[in-house]
Amino acid sequence: MRLVVCLVFLASFALVCQGQVYKGGYTRPIPRPPPFVRPLPGGPIGPYNGCPISCRGISFSQARSCCSRLGRCCHVGKGYSG
């Protein structure tokens, strides 16, 4: 009798530890929402792309980002291409 009680207890404990008994509710951390993305500074923003209309006033890293993401590349004296 004691053996049966012990085995039932161990089996129920194993199920609780594996999470088989409680299938609903909070089981893992809630993922953090993505950070707010601000438009690049340096002039008016083009429609829906987040890159400035003009190449003036933007940093090298901003220009490189617009070029690699959207194909809008700044050229010296010419402005955007693409």
Swiss-Prot record:
Keyword Signal: yes
Modified residues (Pyrrolidone carboxylic acid): 20
Localisation per UniProt entry: Cytoplasmic granule
Secretion signal span: 1-19
GO biological process: defense response to bacterium; defense response to fungus; killing of cells of another organism
Modified residues (Serine amide): 81
Keywords, sorted A to Z: Amidation, Antibiotic, Antimicrobial, Chitin-binding, Disulfide bond, Fungicide, Pyrrolidone carboxylic acid, Signal
Keyword Signal among record annotations: yes
A single GO molecular function term of this UniProt record: chitin binding
Protein family: Belongs to the penaeidin family.
Function field: Antibacterial and antifungal activity. Presents chitin-binding activity.
Name of this protein: Penaeidin-3d
